[in-house]
A protein has these predicted regions:
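Extracellular ligand-binding/catalytic regions of CAZymes and related secreted enzymes
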Residues: 2-11, 38, 189-195, 203-274
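Catalytic beta-strand/loop cores that center a nucleophilic Ser/Cys/Thr
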Residues: 4, 37, 43, 57-58, ...
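Helical hinge/lid and interdomain linker segments adjacent to catalytic or ligand-binding clefts
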Residues: 8, 13-101
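A glycine-rich, often tryptophan-bearing local segment used as a flexible ligand/cofactor-contacting loop or short
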Residues: 70-150
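Stable alpha-helical elements in mature extracytoplasmic
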Residues: 28, 75, 115, 243-247
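Extended, composition-driven regions rather than compact fold-specific motifs
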Residues: 17-20, 64, 162, 199-203, ...
């Protein structure tokens, strides 16, 4: 006997871009695919970067979890045009980053050049730095927003991003922090003591949602920095039930936009924090 469809909408084409540097992309990819798998309307293609312009332009939604993956002008503008035509872009964690690692023998400072201006403009933000990974309090700026409704403020051990921000962002969650970011060329943004971690912006008929929490790192992910085996994996951020609840809602939004009620992906949607 077949299983009745959970999604009343038709087929939704999703392109998942997951790859880059210094993170456990296998872990992140699996977690995101499991969330997408709750939707029987989804057909998903997998990519490591933004170079397959045709596939991304054909997708109803693009979900990206990358670090130091730098879309060129053609790639960024094609993605922008898709969003403007009603597409959805979910940018997770370090997707907003272009990072130049320290040169061997030089001062150990990471620099974050403005290397992908068209893509940064689409996202509405550009990574500059983050403080050391430590427990941080995450607060709701718009507690009534569907992506966070019913989820309380929480503490998580994660990277809090200090970023250059556009003026048209709707900030949904942020984190208070006014200290330095050791190891980065840009250590602070003068006058800013709160840093958005979940926010959105319109682009034509479509939308972009950015959720910058969600660091993860495997044993062998910083070998290029002289540490062949860290001996441990770091998925602490993903162990937060509040983080998982927000991520689940973000993925649901990517699949069905604001009309997520057309899909009934399982009991866990209403029991996120249990």
């Amino acid at each position: 006997m077949g299983t009745p469809a959970r999604c009343t909408a038709g087929r939704v084409n999703v392109a998942l871009v997951c790859g880059g540097r210094w993170h456990d992309f296998d872990y992140a990819r699996l977690q995101i695919l499991q969330l997408l798998g709750r939707h029987d309307s989804v057909r998903c293609s997998i990519h490591q970067d933004f170079s397959d312009v045709a596939a991304l332009a054909a997708a109803d939604a693009v979900i990206a979890y990358t670090c130091d993956v730098r879309p060129g002008r053609e790639e960024a503008l094609a993605l922008r045009d898709r969003v403007r035509a009603g597409g959805r872009l979910l940018a997770l964690h370090a997707t907003n980053s272009a990072i130049d690692a320290p040169v061997p023998g030089a001062e150990r400072v990471y620099r974050t050049p403005d290397a992908m201006p068209e893509f940064s403009a689409l996202l509405g933000n550009r990574f500059l730095a983050h403080p050391r990974i430590t427990p941080m309090r995450i607060e709701m700026v718009k507690p009534e927003h569907p992506l966070v409704s019913g989820i309380p403020a929480f503490v998580t051990t994660d990277e809090i991003y200090v970023s250059e921000l556009a003026d048209d962002l709707e900030v949904i969650m942020d984190a208070p922090y006014d200290g330095p970011c050791p190891g980065f060329a840009t250590q602070q943004v003068p006058g800013r003591t709160r840093h958005p971690v979940l926010f959105s912006r319109p682009e034509g008929s479509g939308s972009v949602v950015s959720f910058t929490l969600g660091h993860c790192r495997g044993r062998f992910d910083v070998a290029d920095q002289g540490m062949d085996d860290l001996g441990v994996t770091d998925t602490a951020a993903w162990e937060s039930p509040e983080f998982r609840a927000v991520l689940r809602r973000c993925v649901d939004w990517a699949v069905h936009g604001d009309d997520v009620e057309r899909c009934y992906p399982g009991d866990e949607y209403s029991k996120e924090l249990q």
